[in-house]
């Protein structure tokens, strides 16, 4: 499911070419959702919290000083929720989370162009700073969100998507990663 609560809608962008080009393309399928600081975020899939950091202030504009929650799924992939607000983690390391459970509050920590959620799913991990994008775990996989329509081929940058109620899960389009 989209990483925010049903009924809410946000504009989505692909991450900047600076990010993907500077890291060998490992962030190819990362998404940025424009949203105000403090927006409740939910787990796109069930899993176990693999990493948490929420100590940096919003607006620090410093690379590798972003707050995050990372959730490892049963298939070994890791969803990353980045740029959270200070004290914005609502879960702790090792917690089991349900799909749709509130896990964090969005923010503007780290090097950003404004408040947003950076969301991606990596093949393994978690990779922690400063090794965020090291291969093989830095490689992201394409995802679709079953509670956002239309998006059979993934979300389209520049469009606003609303999280719908009902069938809510995220599926990986990569052939080696099963749907959730």
Where do the protein language model's features map onto the residues?
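Zn2+-dependent peptidoglycan hydrolase active-site motif and core
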Residues: 44-93, 115
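Short, charged beta-turn/beta-strand-edge "cap" motif at the junction between a beta-strand
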Residues: 39, 55-57, 103-111
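Short glycine/threonine/proline-enriched tight-turn/helix- or strand-capping micro-motif at secondary-structure
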Residues: 11-45, 52-61, 66-68
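A residue-level detector for short acidic-glycine micro-motifs
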Residues: 14, 51, 83-86, 105-108, ...
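A structural signal for short beta-strand/turn segments enriched in small hydrophobics and glycine
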Residues: 41, 47-49, 94-106
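Histidine-centered divalent-metal-coordination microenvironment in nucleic-acid enzymes
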Residues: 112-120
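Acidic, glycine-rich catalytic/binding loops that coordinate metals and/or anionic ligands
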Residues: 1-4, 13, 92-98, 120-180
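Catalytic cores of extracellular degradative/oxidative enzymes
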Residues: 31-36, 101, 115, 124-128
């Amino acid at each position: 499911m989209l990483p925010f609560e049903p009924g809410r809608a946000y504009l989505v962008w692909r991450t900047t070419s600076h990010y993907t080009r500077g890291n060998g393309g490992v962030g190819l399928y990362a998404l940025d959702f424009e949203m105000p600081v403090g927006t409740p975020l939910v787990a796109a899939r069930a899993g176990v919290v693999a990493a948490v950091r929420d100590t940096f202030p919003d607006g620090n504009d410093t690379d590798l000083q972003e707050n995050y929650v990372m959730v490892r799924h049963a298939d070994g992939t890791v969803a990353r929720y980045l740029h959270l607000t200070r004290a914005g983690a609502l879960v702790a390391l090792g917690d089991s989370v349900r799909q749709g459970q509130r896990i964090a509050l969005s923010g503007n920590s780290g090097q950003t162009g404004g408040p947003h959620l950076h969301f991606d799913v990596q093949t393994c991990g978690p990779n922690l700073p400063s090794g965020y994008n090291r291969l093989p775990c830095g490689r992201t996989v394409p995802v679709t969100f079953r509670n956002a329509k239309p998006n059979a081929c993934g979300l389209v940058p520049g469009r606003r998507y609303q999280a719908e109620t009902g069938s809510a899960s995220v599926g990986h389009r990569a052939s080696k990663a099963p749907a959730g």
